[in-house]
Regions:
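NTP-dependent small-molecule kinase module
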Residues: 3-4, 178-216
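Short beta-strand-centered segment that lines the nucleotide-binding/catalytic pocket of NTP-utilizing
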Residues: 38-56
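The conserved Walker
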Residues: 23
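Hydrophobic anchor at the beta1->P-loop junction of P-loop NTPases
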Residues: 19
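Conserved lysine of the Walker
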Residues: 27
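Hydrophobic positions on the alpha1 helix immediately C-terminal to the Walker A/P-loop
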Residues: 30, 34
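ATP-dependent small-molecule kinase phosphotransfer cores
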Residues: 51-111, 118
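A glycine- and Lys/Arg-enriched "phosphate-lid" helix/loop adjacent to the NTP-binding pocket
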Residues: 131-179
Length: 216
């Protein structure tokens, strides 16, 4: 993304509200409720990951294509959480240009709510003309644990496809905890809005707090 295009992109994306944050922080729920309430369109970055993988190449998304070539144990069991963090393609911003391509192709009226962990602070900030158009939800480890357990714990989805689901779960939780720490540091350094999400946070509370940031 060329810095020469930043002012133009800010203007083209001024109708967008951005909700980033750690995994399992409530981004999807909040974005869906606000989009319905405000009559906005909704763009969930999780929903387009497979499409973006198809539209990418090993040259522009090398980490993604290495990940695709791994088996489930190589992805989630055999590597240290820090290595998993540093080599996870979406955490490193691969494919973010495809998100922007998608957003530019969508109608600008009446507004667009965009959510997902792929919205990295340093990539989003240059696109936001007003600081109240972006917020990151930061889950505590306890909140993340509760969310994962509610989804089935070690038996949840891809974890159950490994030879050691318990270890895969521990690795995933540690990787995601560290990713949230990275988001916390980066948003603080860039002066961006964040909301801490813990086990006392209700869905309605979280929606209201995001509305305050967005001034809706």
């Amino acid at each position: 993304m060329s810095t020469r295009n930043i002012p133009t992109l800010q203007e083209q994306l001024q109708h967008v509200y951005w909700i980033g944050g750690g995994s399992g922080a409530g981004k999807s729920t909040v974005a869906r409720r606000l989009a319905t309430q405000q009559g906005f369109s909704l763009y969930a970055t999780d929903d387009v990951m497979a499409d973006h993988a198809r539209r990418s190449s090993p040259d522009d998304c090398p980490l993604l294509h290495r990940f695709i070539a791994m088996d489930m144990d190589e992805r989630w069991v055999k590597r240290a959480p820090q290595t998993m963090l540093e080599t996870f393609h979406w955490f490193q911003g691969e494919g973010f240009n495809l998100i922007i391509e998608d957003l530019l192709s969508l109608p600008r009226e009446p507004g667009l709510m965009v959510e997902g962990f792929r919205l990295l602070p340093h990539l989003v900030k240059p696109l936001v003309a007003k600081p109240n158009r972006a917020v990151w939800l930061l889950p505590t480890p306890g909140f993340r644990q509760v969310v994962v357990e509610s989804r089935g714990g070690a038996a949840w989805g891809f974890l159950g496809k490994t030879t050691d689901p318990e270890r895969a779960l521990r690795n995933l939780l540690e990787r995601d905890r560290t990713f949230t720490d990275v988001l916390r540091e980066e948003t603080a350094r860039l002066g961006l809005h964040t909301i801490e999400v813990d086990t006392t946070t209700t869905e309605n509370d979280l929606v209201q707090r995001v509305m305050v940031v967005f001034q809706l």
